[in-house]
Structure formats: C-alpha cells, structure tokens
Amino acid sequence: HQLLSPDRRIVRSPRSYNSQIGVPLSVWQLNEEAELGIFEAGISEMGEMNALKRMIKPTIGILTNIGGAHQENFFSLQEKCMEKLTLFKDCDVVIYNGDNELISNCVAKSMLTAREIAWSRKDIERPLYISRVTKKEDHTVISYRYLDMDNTFCIPFIDDASIENVLNCLAACLYLMTPADQITERMARLEPIAMRLEVKEGKNNCVLINDSYNSDLASLDIALDFLVRRSEKKGLKRTLIL
C-alpha cells in the first residue's frame, strides 16, 4: 500500500481482516473510485478458500510464506499450500518465492494458467533475480535484475520476514510497471507495521521490540533472531517476555 498509494486510489484490508468474516468486510469498502484493491486471505481448514475466491476475484495473486498457523486442520503443509493456491486459479499473474521448494512444487502441481513472477536469490533464470541482499546495522541493501535491467534499493528493515515481504511487493510493483526510481525512493521510506517487530527506545538504555501481533512459532523464531542482532550490535542484555 505504501509503495502504490501515491499513484493509485487503493482499498485495502484493515489490519489482518483475512477470515470468512474479515474478507467481506474488507471488500465492502470498494467503490467506483477505487483503482486497486489489496486484500489478505487466510484459511484455517480445507474448503475455505473457494468462498474467499468468489468474494475477492483476484487478478494479481501473491503467495506469501506457508507457516504453521492452523496446521492442526491440515494433513501437511503441502495440503495447506494447495488449498491456498485455489485462490489464484483465475488470476492474470501469480507472484511467489521461487526458492521455496514447497511453494514451487505446489505451483507446478496446481497447473495455474496465470503468468508467473517467481523471484529468486539463487536462480538467475527466474523472472526476477535478486542478485544481492546486504544487511547493515539498521537497513538492508537489495540489488535485483528484471527484464535485463539492474537496480538497487534500500529498506529500513533487517529481519528476514520483512525482506521476503518486500521482495513480493517488488515483484508486484514491477508487474504494475512502477518506474524503478519510484520503487527505490518509496522502499527507503517504508514504515513498519504496528506491533510487528516494532522497535521503541525505552528508558535506561533499553530497547523494546514489540512483536505481539504475531503468535506462531515461525514468527517467534524470526523475532528472536531480530532480537539477537539488535542486542549484539548495541551490547545489550536480552530479555524475552511471552
């Protein structure tokens, strides 16, 4: 939303309104002035995605990381991934992490007719090749190649989850023909999502990292890695509060 809203009238999901109730409330905001809708779709069991597909009718599909949330209602991560891909059956384009073996295999099995923009940090033959990711103390420098053009931008994040999200957003911006210089400028000004690895300066040389918005083990692992990086650079003692 931050990357595209300067040029387009956008309607988006409020926070994570991604359920069978949240999605219709999000779509309800659409009006004749809207040029683009950004909606999150989440599932907790088999069969739910078809209902969300009928509501959203997406043309651009972005498949984010497949985590362990609600896994108790699925036999495997592959089953969950295949269920999520039903949302994209009528899309014009599907964007995903081409280095994720689970996602790549499921996309191949799903026989989608959509154009694929699979980004990769390993395979130079992928449509969007990420040639370098360099983490600094408080920002990350990312270089990429798309349609034989090389570019570089910075983001004010260093955690892996934010980097993966940014690469998905990069692919969407490129598909929508956002100029590279605008992408570079807006990436540098991205603001963090509230309560997701939110860093606040506390008292007595204390730094607070608020990740209360996430609740699964994969997110906790990312948050702990982020905590270690921040504390080591500043020489601080670490305390985890669950």
Write out the residue ranges for each language-model feature.
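Acidic-glycine-rich active-site phosphate/pyrophosphate-binding loop
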Residues: 1, 132-152, 195, 199
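Phosphate-binding loop of NTP-binding sites
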Residues: 1-98, 102-113, 176
